[in-house]
Amino acid sequence: MHEMEGSAVPEHTYRDAGVDIDLEARAVRALIDKLTYRRTGAFSMLGEVGHFAGLIDCGSYVLALAVDGVGTKMLVADALQDWRTVGIDCVAMNVNDLYVMNLEPVAFVDYIATDSLSPEKMAQIGEGLNEGARQANMNIVGGETATLRGLVKGLDLAGTCLGVQKKDLVITGEAIVPGDVIVGLPSSGIHSNGLTLARKIVEECASYDTPLPNGKTLGEDILTPTRIYAGVLRVTEGCSIHGMCHITGGGLLNFRRLADYGFSITAPLEVPAIFRWLQETGDIDGAEMYRTFNMGMGYAYIAPPRSVATIESAIPGARVVGEVAEEPGVWLRGIDIR
């Protein structure tokens, strides 16, 4: 991708659309800094708050919790009056965070906050939640629905997922070393991040009925559900994996959550049509795109070179996109995108 020249459309950024990643990081850190209490005795916490999932020590096993939501993708579903796939997104955003640590999702609860209830909308959301649970082989054991008129406008869909794994099989990223390779896995599209910026561009410059070169409309493409990377756990059973990364909000900057090394992307995966359209129409800087969206890579392995053949043969579309370097940072073709 590249910066567009000569466009009459003002350059768009995620911050201008209302999401300041740097401010969000500072705000989250301010919250985490106050979470100092740790349980004593059995079932203590392993590691620190801030990884993709939180771990609880259960002897030879660990339990893990992840929480996430669909975000403003719900507003696109509202615009199209189609909520059938947002439940898949909700499940995916949670289970993919568990897969990063080689955890098996086993149970899920959803949380719906809304200003008004619609049985039709709830049925469609339930359809997607059930399909997501099927893909992840996971139980949905309950949930909470809150009607909060005056506090909520629209509907916010989120969930919490419980995972489990033998303690000695958990992957935290601590084994990552310079010289490891980064193997990218294709996304299904925009997934569930960067929608605030995407919606701003669509609503200012086009419509959800606008066709893309891939034969879909913008609305159809955006509502394509987040890919559930259930197959990644099979790979960890057969070869050495030092770390994994779910490319969500913040794009490539998610690699910084794994280790204090450099992550250099030299050969990115093919960029889907939706991202090319957003960049060209919104006149978005290339680095800004990779700081905001997954850009076609929704998940990645960090592994020694000897593991590449096993990964590529097991996961369709997986291939080497870069490597780990000594100097901390995240680079895209040599450009520091921090």
Segments predicted by a language model, with ranges:
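A structural signal for small-residue-enriched, beta-sheet-centric alpha/beta enzyme cores
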Residues: I182-I190, M244-G251
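Short, acidic Gly/Pro/Ser/Thr-rich loop/turn segments
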Residues: V70-M74, K166-L169, I190-S192, G250-L252, ...
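Glycine-rich phosphate/pyrophosphate-binding loop regions near the starts of catalytic domains
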Residues: I32-S188
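Short, compositionally biased
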Residues: L195-A206
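Glycine-/charge-enriched secondary-structure boundary and capping motifs
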Residues: H2-E5, P10-G18, A27, K121-N139, ...
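A short secondary-structure junction signal
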Residues: V170-G173, N193-L197
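A generic structural signal for residues located within well-ordered alpha-helices
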Residues: V19, L23, V86, N193, ...
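Acidic/polar, glycine-rich intrinsically disordered N-terminal extensions of enzymes
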Residues: Y14-R38
